[in-house]
């Protein structure tokens, strides 16, 4: 009887503890924040090159500007932090467009240098899965990938 009682208590405690640990969190990306030197220069780049729409900076802090990335996601440009940021190509903003070829023509017209992943100038990279991609940099040196996943 004692063994059965202990077994039921152990099972009940295990179920109770598992129920406590079963809380999961479903996250979604809300925004990407970039530390920039000149918020107005960066804002002009993102609105002109990527044609992002500016939205109200709800933080109401000077030196910060917000843009719509799409699907409820935002880009926040922040110039109030003056620390240096180390940037390399592995840290990049990846964007997809159904109009990939038209976008490549657009940045070519705007004379914005782009490359494939290895760094060959004016070259479109084609991944093993057939997705086209290019990489270019914003005024602060952040890498941006635009790819054809949405096609």
What is each stretch, according to the model?
Residues 38-40, 93-140, 151:
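Vicinal oxygen chelate
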Residues 20-40, 91-95:
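N-terminal beta-strand motif that seeds the catalytic metal site of vicinal oxygen chelate
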Residues 26-28, 85-90, 127-128:
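Short glycine-enriched loop/turn motifs at secondary-structure junctions
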Residues 34-74:
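Core segments of cupin and vicinal oxygen chelate
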Residues 32, 65, 133-136:
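Generic short beta-strand
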């Amino acid at each position: 009887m004692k063994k059965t009682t202990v077994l039921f208590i152990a099972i009940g405690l295990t179920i109770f503890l598992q129920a406590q640990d079963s809380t999961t969190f479903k996250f979604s990306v809300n925004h990407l924040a970039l530390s920039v030197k000149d918020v107005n220069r960066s804002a002009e780049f993102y609105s002109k090159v990527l044609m992002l729409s500016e939205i109200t900076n709800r933080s109401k802090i000077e030196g910060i500007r917000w843009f719509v990335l799409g699907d409820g996601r935002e880009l926040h440009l922040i110039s109030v932090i003056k620390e240096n940021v180390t940037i390399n190509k592995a840290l990049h903003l990846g964007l997809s467009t159904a109009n990939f070829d038209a976008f490549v023509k657009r940045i070519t017209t705007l004379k914005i240098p782009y490359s494939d992943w290895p760094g060959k100038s004016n070259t479109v990279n084609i991944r093993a899965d057939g997705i086209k991609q290019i990489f270019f940099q914003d005024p602060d040196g952040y890498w941006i990938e635009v790819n054809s996943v949405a096609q």
